[in-house]
Amino acid sequence: MSKKPKVGMWSGLTAVTAVLTAGAIVGTTVAFHYTTTVNNYLDADTYKIIKGDSDEDTEYFKSDFTSDEERESYEAELCAQVEAEGAALLKNDNNALPLASGAKVSLFGHGSVDLMYGGTGSGSVDTSKAPNFKQALEDQGIQVNSTLWDLYSSDDMMKNYSRITPAAISDTLEANTQYAVNEAPWSKLSSAESSFADYGDAAIVVFSRSGGEGADLPSGENGTNDSWIKGQEGDGNYLALSAEEKELLQNLKTLKDNGTFKKIIVLINSSNAIEMDFLNPEICGEDYGIDSAMWIGDVGQTGINGVAQLLAGEATPSGSLVDSYLYDNMANPAMYNFYTQAYPNAADYNLLTDGPDVQGMYSVYQEGIYLDYRYYETRYEDAVMGTGNAGDYNWSTTVAFPFGYGDSYTTFEYSDFNVTESADAFNVTLKVTNTGSTYSGKETVQLYFQSPYTDYDKANGIEKASAELCGFAKTDILAPGASETVNITVDKSELRTYDANNAKTYIVDAGDYYFTVAGSAHEAMNN
């Protein structure tokens, strides 16, 4: 008679132990990845301070503040100042801004009640104590349409027409693809329409977009992807206005034409470059009647106070764009490479599974230095001069607002431009005068240079831009008629170019180098 193997407690324990071991491995991995989140939730102490017997002062970095409250107050004021000096005025027809004292305005767009305060990842912002747009405007004496504000803030609107943004650094690739503008259709505003006339000094529209670390913008092959969500009427282009946003502008234009609203002001609440075709009727084919537009970026914890100061005229815009803004982002060749591509053999090595550490994707970087204004302005020069390989290129129908652009409520004049050379640097001085008659303000002075493009450069494939920013400075607040001498120092190393193919080091070509001050990269090219 054969013996039966003994199965019982030990085999059961083995199975249980195996399951527990697997669970412990998985749990440890997950817990390690979310260490900060878990510790914060459990209110766990992760360090201990042990004081020694020495009398040595170990506080090496002394605070300038006597209390946390004093520090927080300073930070709040600084954030507002950074926003007020960083926002860029894009257009201001008929001096639509600033608003008159005590103006009564209506705020439109879901972004007006749900601002982009910060980005994702390390760029996120604690909004628990952040002022909202209505509060900020009222602090400046501007009256806000409460009926419309309450409608946009209602549970129904917040539930059904809120911006959809993926959680940063999600566990799943799918979660990182869910984007939607999700602007409320005009019909949803009908219950507040009777209040518009009483708050008709201006219709202020806020267009917001999100995107950043761990929550990259929707992209697909050749720059678009119809599977990404854009809104109720999407074509895959998250950085263009949605159908509902265009409908909003169309109806506001009708109300402006019949006298309900005196002016339409648009605020671009995004650190990602939204397409600007809607600001130019000749480009988009429709006149939305927009009087003024301002780029405010992500406003930070208290930066919306700075925006309100600009709208009320308490501050004068002096910011400059740090990107070129296009009518159509597909005019940027880099867009054709900016999409998720998988290595051909990624699946063989299990590199396409969901998770925060997926390593199966790549992007092609083939533009060299020719990104943003270095591309647009270099191709512009080639097109004008008939050099290079510019092809059929029209700068004016491509670039809406160039790198460095930013208007003001006043005007400035430059004079007495002078360049002196030392052993290691060039020193540039010029006089800046506020030539306006009403508003005080600051001026951002931008210094650009152009280096010679030699036969050696061409033979060795050396990349050079037609204009390069090499320095900048901002004046103090200048009253009408006041002047200030600005000084900008440029280290000579800034003029170097990398020779990757022959010398394999930085070189400085012999020839003529030109410096110019300008209000944008494009203005520099035309100086």
Name every feature range the model reports, one short phrase each.
Residues 1-527:
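C-terminal non-catalytic regions of proteins with extracellular/luminal or membrane-system context
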